[in-house]
Amino acid sequence: MGISIVIFEICLLWGQILSTASQSRSSTPDWWNHGGTINDVIYDTQETPEVTTTQVPDSTSIGTDSGLAVRLVNGGDRCRGRVEILYQGSWGTMCDDGTDSGLAVRLVNGGDRCRGRVEILYQGSWGTMCDDSWDINDANVVCRQLGCGWALSAPGSAQFGQGLGPIVLDDVACRGHEAYLWSCSHRGWLSHNCGHQEDAGVICSDSQTSSPTPGWWNPGGTNNDVIYDTQETTETSQTSSPTPDWWNHGGTINDVIYDTQETTEGTDSGLAVRLVNGGDRCRGRVEILYQGSWGTVCDDSWDINDANVVCRQLGCGWALSAPGSAQFGQGSGSIVLDDVACRGHEAYLWSCSHRGWLSHNCGHQEDAGVICSYSQTSSPTPDSQTSSPTPGWWNPGGTNNDVSYGPEQTTDATDSGLAVRLVNGGDRCQGRVEILYQGSWGTVCDDSWDTKDANVVCRQLVCGWALSAPGSAHFGQGSGSIVLDDVACTGHEAYLWSCSHRGWLSHNCGHHEDAGVICSDAQTQSTTWPDMWPTTTPETTTDWWTTKYSSSVPTTQFPTIADWWTTPSPEYTCGGLLTLPYGQFSSPYYPGSYPNNARCLWKIFVSSMNRVTVVFTDVQLEGGCNYDYILVFDGPENNSSLIARVCDGFNGSFTSTQNFMSVVFITDGSVTRRGFQADYYSTPISTSTTSPTTFPIVTDWWTTPSPEYTCGGLLTLPYGQFSSPYYPGSYPNNARCLWKIFVPSMNRVTVVFTDVQLEGGCNYDYILGFDGPEYNSSLIARVCDGSNGSFTSTQNFMSVVFITDGSVTRRGFQADYYSTPIRTSTTPPTTFPIITGNDSSLVLRLVNGTNRCEGRVEILYRGSWVPCADDSWDINDANVVCRQLGCGSALSAPGNAWFGQGSGLIVLDDVSCSGYESHLWNCRHPGWLVHNCRHVEDAGVICSLPDPTPSPGPVWTSPPFVNYTCGGFLTGLSGQFSSPYYPGSYPNNARCLWNIEVPNNYRVTVVFRDVQLEGGCNYDYIEIFDGPHHSSPLIARVCDGAMGSFTSTSNFMSVRFTTDHSVTRRGFRADYYSDFDNNTTNLLCLSNHMRASVSRSYLQSMGYSSRDLVIPGWNVSYQCQPQITQREVIFTIPYTGCGTTKQADNETINYSNFLKAAVSNGIIKRRKDLHIHVSCKMLQNTWVNTMYITNNTVEIQEVQYGNFDVNISFYTSSSFLYPVTSSPYYVDLDQNLYLQAEVLHSDTSLALFVDTCVASPHPNDFSSLTYDLIRSGCIRDETYQSYSSPSPRITRFKFSSFHFLNRFPSVYLQCKLVVCRANDVSSRCYRGCVVRSKRDVGSYQEKVDVVLGPIQLQSPSKEKRSLDLAVADVEKPASSQEVYPTAAIFGGVFLALVVAVAAFTLGRKTRTARGQPPSTKM
């Protein structure tokens, strides 16, 4: 009877585990041998229950401890047969309950195990699947089952070739959450109506990232004492993964160890940590491997800080709780640690303060446990650079010899036997480049090695983009072959060996020229620098101690200080550009001593509408704040306020006011210590004006944990689970927990609440779900007691907030989340209801419009759809509606039943929103069903754009792409831009140009966060130009998937987005920021002169005094002599004097001069002449300032961009004698308005031309609803008239005042002016009307944008009037006797390209509640 019980337990447990795990792992067991001998073989995967061993102690824990093993016998090969388990020293069989005996899945013919044709092992044979109904949900199940991440695509039509044998399944319909593919709905086994030409395939996210087969395959030899450690590669035995390379036909394998473990991590020899008895590897009793035995930890002083260290060490996220009292059962053996006291930032548990090894005063009833955030989710493989795993082959009873093969760096390959890795850099994303070729690792020569080559390596290793491409064996000299030389990549290749090169093994260099790479992801990891350098003494050079520093590159390099008095040492790197939403950085060599005379700059640049918070977790510097210190700036280093100066012993945090922060670490020439370590993260900039009603205990995982509990966190896996604190125990009072769920792009987030037991009533304890960031997204739902259900976001980001009051706690809640791909529909529904309210019975929609984002406003109230009245209805109310429906911002708020009259009750009237409410019914109103109007006053809304990302209601299709706008002129210090309709599909045949201009002597950096375009760089692409696009060199062409950053050499950059006529995708999103350039030289192009300045210290470094620098031939003229200050030599150079030359060519005007410093007397010279060339280049409306220095060896180039000054004013009459000086300027409707514009510049040979003037009811939108006065020089309005002017530099014109109909309150006028060379009849100013196609891809004229106004029209009465409007109509007076409204006009002087605005404003009923002036309702 006892034996029956034991067998029954094994059947249940192993039947369950093997059905979930053994079919998701694949490796050749190490004990398999054809004709050979196997000794001391250990097969350890730990995350699955598969453990095969011949020398293990007994174990009481079924399925995890090393006393268990599994094998397949009597099947003919190692991957089939009867399942037998080694239990208590004897092999036994396993019953088949729940295991789906004989079922397995694999992907073949795809190049790696995570992509290919889907095949299922059924009844002993591999068969294929038909692609009928095959989609991304089905593919997700396959990817998850194989441990390959999530699905990128689900190709059909035998994309990976036609299979053989039976077609096993057809019409598969998965929901996406099934554990096995055969658990999905399908037609039936072997039932189908298709052929192999329809075989289904899958491409998973982990494709091309797994380690390839190493080249030391031994088909007939002997391998002794081999350790093969892949750490991250775990496969199912049924997949077509490669056979391990130690496979031996006819040979002998001794002491073979195959290690894919994920649950033990360590650094000290013999130390490791694991969690047992918790159901998965991320929860359970804490055990430490010490002196060859596993022991427990006592729970004295055990808290969340200690648990956080364990979770991070195991790659299990962060700690949810730290249970004690042997919650996961009592352990056996020694109690290894007691009184553990971690700060929470230690790398290893044993690094924390503790009582001492094996010293304790407790028993196993106090064994400590941990529950990590990744528990019950698909736990990711811990990054190799963040922890050092203790090999899972540790065998206290066996023998292991010392030969180890452990490719700890990530390798990536496609061709058989080819792979790339980075070594000797401290983590997998930086180091010496090595390629696996013909079975051996070899290096790459640095001839022609540059950032383009490095970018290919970084992208291939999934390490971001390249920060630098160091050569000269920066990461130490390699050994073995030099595999490649003269590598010349374009930067877009998929693999390094796809680039042009000299040929395999062909080179003319030595290992002292080995190439290296530093990728962007390397800077975001903990920079713990190991002793990686060779111990041999390099050849001594004469200038090895010189500090290498350049502000133009993102990293700073210094020589290592060890033994500096005898031998040179390899260099290290510090500083960098950090662009991820969170990460970590530290001083060089941390936790070792930092070097002397260091200056490291970290630029932390996160997404717009976010702030940066830096938390210093460990600061140990030289005492005194004048020697070694850290500076924190609120933006770029050279032009931002100093937030803090951090000195020795300080721990704390600082937050920026924007999305950019600079951190500078400076040390002096003596005394070095441990250094510092810091974490950073981004948080949304709150737009809320009121503080939360409850105190935020913990809102993010990076926040310092509460002494009692933690809650909330950042969830980035494609699926997972979270719950209230202490669930299923009672949650705490006054809690506020925020979970940020961020899944892969082109996916939505769905949260399913499986258990919700809160205090009754929705005003006390509740859960809020937001469609994006908490503070600037619409509320999806308010979940209260008993409200089980699911909610889906419209994007790949959802925020969930749990709030409790000060009394009554209950069980809490538990929720699952998962991601699903965004799909589109071909037929839009006629109405678009979306449940968004606090009350599930309230629904908002827009009807009778052309899409879901415009129409009559209707609310579902008590089961019926009812409209809203237009009394007090304005743009603020409309903004709330648009944001609530995910439709952008409001363009207008038409009333008077513009979209037709509704029927039934009128639910709301006199709605008065501030514009920031989350729901329309949260705005002020008299009450439900309280009104004094009829359906002729039904309110409507027109939103900016239909959202191409459907909401969780009915799906819809974007309207035809006919009236979109893209591109623009960006002048802020930082900002963001994206492709049209992003994240929806961009349109075909798009030509979008963004011109980014920042202040003089700044540089522009653009960071591409997301690039998803049509594959192939000849169809849809982004081009980055180092200045205006039509006259500047191309920096880069960005194609599908090629994210990265690019920096201009001037203060101007152009970005052009081009698409062809077919295939559209998600598009791109980019941020830009500006950074101050070096101050050696400086050039400004002003309206009357150039101002060139040169640093005196720079002149001195070149061997010249400040008086040696002159304008050649003009040094005797007083006006051409420089002003010499304490720091600079400043020249004021007129455009028409001091030797300035003027050259006109191809629609440009160049003003050039140069400065010179030279030896003026003597027979010989030992100093090089110094020439500084300066020029101001005008491109129609843009000044291009260039400054460069030539002195035979040193060239410094400065490029700046500026603008014309333009004065534009209203005049009283056509004589243009008297400008309007009153403000406001009152005019009648249809009154003539006279304007004069003049370009301000000392050069008199310029001309000004009015190219386009467009009117709009909106100040910032001149595309949706416009009226043209003149366009491209072609007059469109009958009242427009130009006048002769006394000078080509002046232009004069007039038009009659007007206003738009349909209650648009304002009219804004935008004019584009062109600057040309006077008397040049070929220029734009003399060509008049030019008809140009909408998407002309040829060169075009840049213009000066000027917006005039405002002009306010006041109605003579406050009575309601109904106005009919055709969108393009402009109202004219009915008769000359009619009383016209008047308008107030403001004019002024504006910089060209700076918008100056003219508005004709129509008012309506007074709304004193908002503090606005009275206006008239029409």
From Swiss-Prot:
Source species, domain of life: Eukaryota
Positions of the CUB domain: 574-683, 711-820, 966-1075
Q: Membrane-spanning regions, if any?
A: 1383-1403
Start and end residues of each stretch annotated as Disordered: 375-410
PTM comment text: Highly N- and O-glycosylated. The O-glycans are heavily sulfated.
Tell whether Cell inner membrane is among the UniProt keywords.
Answer: no
Where does it mainly reside? secreted
Q: Enumerate the GO terms in the molecular function aspect.
A: zymogen binding
| The ZP domain, residue ranges | 1084-1332
> Where found, per UniProt?
Secreted; Cytoplasmic vesicle, Secretory vesicle membrane
Q: What the protein does?
A: May play roles in mucosal defense system, cellular immune defense and epithelial differentiation. May play a role in liver regeneration. May be an important factor in fate decision and differentiation of transit-amplifying ductular (oval) cells within the hepatic lineage. May function as a binding protein in saliva for the regulation of taste sensation. May play a role as an opsonin receptor for SFTPD and SPAR in macrophages tissues throughout the body, including epithelial cells lining the gastrointestinal tract.
Assigned protein family: Belongs to the DMBT1 family.
Indicate the quaternary assembly: Binds SFTPD and SPAR in a calcium-dependent manner. Interacts with LGALS3.
> Per its record, how is this protein called by name?
Scavenger receptor cysteine-rich domain-containing protein DMBT1
The organism encoding this protein is Rattus norvegicus
**The gene coding this protein:** Dmbt1
